[in-house]
Amino acid sequence: MLNHVVTRFAPSPTGHLHLGGARTALFNWLYAKHNNGKFLLRIEDTDSKRSSKELIDSIINSMIWLNIQHDGEIILQSSRISRHIEIANQLILNDKAYYCYCSEEEINLEKEQYTKKGLHYKHNCIWKNRKPPTGNCSKVIRLHSDTEGITEFKDKVYGTIAVNNVQLDDMVLLRSNNTPTYLLSVVVDDYDMGITHIIRGTDHLTNTARQLLIYNALGWKPPEFAHIPLIHDENGNKLSKRHHALGIHEYKNAGILPEALVNYLLRMGWSHGNDELITIDEAIRWFSIDKVGQSPAGLDSKKLEFLNNHYINTTNNATIIEMIIPIIEKTIGYKVNTEKIGYLLNGINELKKRTKNLVNLANESLFYVEDIPISFDQESLIIIKSNHDILSILYDNLSKVLNDDWNNSTLTSMIKNIVKDYNTKIHNIYHCLRASIIGRINAPSIIDIMVNFQREECLNRIKYARDMVK
């Protein structure tokens, strides 16, 4: 266990929290918890045109839902702009940065010339060693970057990473409108927040090399870095919040449990032997960066379904019902009768066994809690319309069964007698019972459901179905 570990998650509120961001947050959180450290949350909201409070709230709510809890107050990067400007000016005073007065047109022309020659573009500012022009000229602050040698760091996933300095230009630190760039703001914030370890995607590798130049210019000790492989979709294409990636809120709305999604994210690039089902306590105890692989992680919808089914079945029934009742009420358009929740509580175990998600479970549970008239699927309607006589026979015979005798044995015997007395087929009887009582043909044991509903509810439903086709 390491001493004094501080990690962070620093999302940009230009979109909802997606899988890649959630996994980054999870890995940083687990690393901090494993080492008894702190996990901080910083919202990088300096892009005022694309950031919004709605998206900030969405990110925070998604993290709360996933139970990835940050320590301390949330830091808004926009509240620290004056500090970023202060550091940019400090670099000027220490001759580690300079004012660039090149116009946008001049820079674009320079880029074109490099492109024509097939060279990697690196801005060569003519003002680097000149006196500033007279008058009120637009300017930016650029870092004095090394033009020779390499920038090297040890990554906790990929080992030693070396970037040729010829690829790193004199990056802009402060724009002409006096706003800091991402590269400067991140370095200053991470340093001031005491961040010791940064875990993020491999798409930041070049950013890391650039940020190390800023750390060196300031004489600050950089944090340790771990770059985790990106997530690919099921076709092997890179996932991003602009392409194919669902937001965490969409997984929630689709009926995925947070425990299932966390387990799913955990196994995207990290492993602990052959373990697939991992509790959060086990994850905290076992998590280490050296178990993160270097190959991209891929989406696997079947695995997510498996995990979700597992966590639905291991969550107590009362909690699951509390989750699905709002979905049911939205579907049927009225408040569920408390008495009928008892039917659902008695019958939900069978439904849980084969469900993929809470939305599916809610739809499969409708017949338990619906008032008459219940909803019928198309197949049930066809059966009801063509079996009026059978429904009448079922109603008349079941009406003779007393409440105290309404049990599995009595009902099974009666159905056998009806088949014998009326020369019909048993599967036709069961189809009629399912169609009239639950409105569908595919369901758990109809006898068990009838015992659960008891006599009055079953007779009322059969009577309604029979009378539909009088």
Swiss-Prot record:
InterPro entries: aa-tRNA-synth_I_cd-bd, aa-tRNA-synth_I_codon-bd_sub2, aa-tRNA-synth_I_CS, aa_tRNA-synth_I_cd-bd_sf, Glu-tRNA-ligase_bac/mito, Glu/Gln-tRNA-synth, Glu/Gln-tRNA-synth_Ib_cat-dom, GluQ/Sye
Major site of localization recorded for this protein: cytoplasm
Residues of the signal peptide: none
GO biological process, any: glutamyl-tRNA aminoacylation
HAMAP family: Glu_tRNA_synth_type1
Record flagged with keyword Amino-acid biosynthesis: no
Organism: Ehrlichia ruminantium (strain Gardel)
Keywords assigned by UniProt, alphabetized: Aminoacyl-tRNA synthetase, ATP-binding, Cytoplasm, Ligase, Nucleotide-binding, Protein biosynthesis
Motif 'KMSKS' region, residue range(s) on this chain: 238-242
One Pfam short name: tRNA-synt_1c
UniProt lineage: Bacteria, Pseudomonadati, Pseudomonadota, Alphaproteobacteria, Rickettsiales
UniProt short sequence motif 'HIGH' region, positions renumbered to this chain: 11-21
Subcellular location: Cytoplasm
Superkingdom, natural source: Bacteria
Biological role stated in the UniProt entry: Catalyzes the attachment of glutamate to tRNA(Glu) in a two-step reaction: glutamate is first activated by ATP to form Glu-AMP and then transferred to the acceptor end of tRNA(Glu).
Family of the protein in this entry: Belongs to the class-I aminoacyl-tRNA synthetase family. Glutamate--tRNA ligase type 1 subfamily.
Binding site for ATP: K241
GO CC annotations, alphabetized: cytosol
Reaction(s) the record says it catalyses: tRNA(Glu) + L-glutamate + ATP = L-glutamyl-tRNA(Glu) + AMP + diphosphate
Molecular function terms from GO: ATP binding; glutamate-tRNA ligase activity; tRNA binding; zinc ion binding
EC number, as in UniProt: 6.1.1.17
Identification of the protein by name: Glutamate--tRNA ligase 2
Subunit structure: Monomer.
Keyword match Chaperone: no
